[in-house]
């Protein structure tokens, strides 16, 4: 196998995303009659990005966006007081910070002076909540008088305020207005409802200039909130269970980028929203492991190598490298045994192969090998 070094290092922009899972225990009442309750008992909010977006145009993704200085501002301290405050804001002991790569470089904002700002795990949660409001009109807020800490069960989103469109326009233009909206509603971002789930870094690909270091949080709601796409970054949405999203992807109704497909398949492990919520609470102290996929180009496809795979090289050269081989994907698969990889045959056909054990009390997807009829 060979690699090709790209001149000049990339930098990742820090970002946060919410995987929003909502209970769905009874049939919908829409006319004409729509889908029955999903087998999993919950559905995920998938937002369709505008085809005019520069990054992943047209993809169905989880809500999220780039961390802004306003998300870390010390101005939030007054809103969280007196019930919630430094050092942990009721989030419990600090989780471990883990990385599966030995020498990840600093992100753009590490060189700024963050003295007096909020802890990172608070700021990332505020960012994720703000983006859910901007993109989907979903308000994950909690009254200021509520006790801190995670709720024993899934919660509810706040009803949209009067003047939703006006508030959203202001927040989109200046994220500092999100603090003002929260103060107006006498609420705080419900950072306690966001559970550590995963963290993905954009791998190196030729022609790709945008790279992100994204923390994914899982939020469980008892029922789906109303969704109002902003019709700018987001042009549509759907609620889909893991099995429904997989089938929509394979039938080319939607396109899921590899990280989203992996997470959808990971969530297929859970039989109910209650099981998922309990699982999140049970691994709250394990933190997020940051994964940097390494791309292996084969003669007839592409393999996203993930930590633990026997071909995954924890070498800083691959921060800016592709791996390549003249062998076909099938040959590569026959040669190995220790797999943690996403095999991409084309835009709407991925296989997931996992033979390694999960770490840090997490779960990995089960092997997901598509029927040959899709080829």
Curated annotation (Swiss-Prot):
It is found in: Peroxisome. Its main location: other. A motif (Nudix box) lies at residues 116-137. It is an enzyme of class 3 (hydrolase). Residues 91-116 are annotated as: Disordered. Keywords: Hydrolase, Magnesium, Manganese, Metal-binding, Peroxisome. GO terms for biological process: butyryl-CoA catabolic process; coenzyme A catabolic process; fatty acid catabolic process; malonyl-CoA catabolic process; medium-chain fatty-acyl-CoA catabolic process; propionyl-CoA metabolic process; succinyl-CoA catabolic process. This is Acyl-coenzyme A diphosphatase NUDT19. It comes from Homo sapiens (Human).
């Amino acid at each position: 196998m060979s690699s090709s070094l790209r001149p000049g290092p990339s930098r990742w922009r820090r970002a946060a995303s919410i995987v929003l899972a909502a209970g769905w225990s009874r049939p919908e009442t829409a006319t004409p009659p729509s889908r029955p309750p999903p087998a999993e008992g919950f559905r995920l909010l998938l937002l369709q990005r505008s085809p005019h977006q520069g990054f992943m145009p047209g993809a169905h993704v989880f809500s999220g966006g780039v961390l802004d200085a306003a998300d870390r501002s010390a101005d939030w301290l007054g809103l969280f007081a007196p019930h919630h405050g430094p050092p942990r804001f009721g989030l419990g002991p600090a989780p471990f910070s883990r990385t599966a790569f030995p020498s990840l470089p600093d992100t753009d904002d590490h060189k700024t002076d963050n003295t007096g700002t909020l802890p990172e795990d608070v700021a990332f949660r505020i960012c994720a909540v703000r983006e859910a409001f901007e993109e989907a009109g979903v308000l994950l807020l909690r009254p200021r008088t509520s006790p801190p800490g995670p709720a024993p069960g899934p919660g509810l989103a706040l009803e949209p305020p009067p003047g939703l469109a006006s508030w959203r326009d202001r927040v989109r233009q200046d994220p500092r207005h999100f603090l003002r909206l929260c103060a107006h509603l006498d609420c705080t971002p419900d950072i306690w409802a966001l559970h550590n789930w995963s963290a993905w870094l954009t791998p190196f690909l030729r022609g790709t200039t945008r790279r992100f270091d994204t923390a994914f949080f899982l939020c469980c709601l008892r029922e789906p909130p109303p969704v109002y796409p902003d019709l700018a970054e987001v042009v549509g949405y759907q609620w889909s269970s893991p099995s429904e999203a997989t089938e929509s992807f394979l039938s080319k109704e939607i396109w899921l980028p590899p990280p989203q497909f992996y997470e959808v398949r990971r969530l297929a492990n859970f039989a109910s929203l209650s099981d998922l919520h309990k699982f999140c609470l049970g691994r709250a102290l394990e933190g997020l492991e940051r994964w940097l996929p390494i791309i292996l180009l084969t003669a007839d496809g592409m393999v996203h190598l993930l930590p633990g795979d026997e071909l995954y090289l924890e070498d800083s050269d691959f921060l800016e490298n592709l791996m390549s081989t003249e062998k076909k994907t099938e040959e590569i698969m026959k040669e190995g045994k220790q797999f943690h990889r996403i095999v991409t045959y084309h835009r709407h056909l991925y296989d997931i192969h996992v033979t390694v054990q999960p770490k840090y009390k997490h779960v990995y997807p089960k092997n997901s090998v598509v029927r040959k009829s899709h080829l």
